[in-house]
């Protein structure tokens, strides 16, 4: 269509400006932190949010702010109805080992580098410039096009709930650019919870697990864990050092130890990945617990918890030994991620993130796990549950988005997807994830050296512009 070709050319013209805007947004380290009444998710998240709202105002769009909890940028329509584009501006912690500054926003080698380039600042900027190009080319949408800005997608979604309670009208349909192409029509349910164990007081002398920590986010495979061990009997450290060396050689683990005062610190490095795809990571907590299982601790409670972990969780990714190995034909196997751990002399807390199939319920998952935990005398503290979504592949929304994707890529083989990831799509009735990762591209969100191709930023903006046009235009 001639009009959309004009829009595509405008997006190409805006390329430098678009990349500069993304670089500026990446430079804000918007990890959600301690907040205030005016800045609920901390200074940096609010700074990224205000920067995005200002872009909207400068482009001639109207904006709405729900008291700093979230907001939107509106491309006003001539009729009733809203088409939503739902993104987020918060990011997960950067971690270690980057080749570029994680918040440098550096443009080099054809990429924009930094935390949030793929998840989700890059796609948000591409969506914004899709709207901007349509406006610059004179498009008058029948339905209002709304870019919704979430601020705590990575940490709890309280901001989105607050926003939804205060916005006057919700989208009739839309997409979130926070997943994979071609279209994600269904998402597994999500459970996050803590397994709690209490230890009796130890008596006598021997090895004591003073502390054990690992992981930084419930929705990521932990890439680092460390334990501090004290030896009140004496003579145990040499054996631990020998065991570390043996495991490093036999299993190729990235494990090391060093003296810290009168204690010994054992550190493990794994590989981070999104919790929905634990097979792409290496769980540092599981490696460390496997190692600790080779030692004998003075406190029986400590030893029992280590044994529980290795016997019931270990390196399993699907809950096979802890009572929750559900699966279905539509969405595959449940995934189980031991995400964070905090152990001291008195207690242990293990934070778990599960993605369960669309055909089962969270209650079924909990029932199987609690039956196992009861046998150990351990408790469970339930966190927030996110219910699965399942939109028909033949629906109008999915059909329009599939047609748009195919017209830009020539990919007629890929079909609508079902995933374990949790996006803002599940907070709305008729919203699906639509990009921004193309088939065959590596998964870089939540990982070190996150980046996005400059060419893909242009392609994303063009795809999203056509999708917005088709969904928001007046009916023939």
Sequence positions of predicted segments:
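N-terminal helical capping/dimerization or prosegment-like subdomains
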Residues: 1-84, 91-94, 351, 452, ...
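Buried hydrophobic packing segments
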Residues: 52, 124-134, 163, 288-291, ...
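An extended, acidic, His-containing surface patch that forms the Zn2+-binding/catalytic region
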Residues: 64, 272-345, 355-364, 379-476
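A generic structural motif
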Residues: 71-73, 227, 262-269, 350-352, ...
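Active-site metal-coordination/substrate-binding segment of hydrolases
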Residues: 81-149, 155, 167, 172, ...
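Phosphate-handling active-site elements
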Residues: 108-110, 131-146, 239, 297-303, ...
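Acidic/histidine-rich catalytic neighborhood of metal-dependent amide-processing enzymes
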Residues: 120-200, 206, 241-245, 249-252, ...
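Acidic-enriched catalytic cores of C-N bond-cleaving enzymes acting on peptides and small amides
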Residues: 185-188, 192-213, 218-271, 275-336, ...
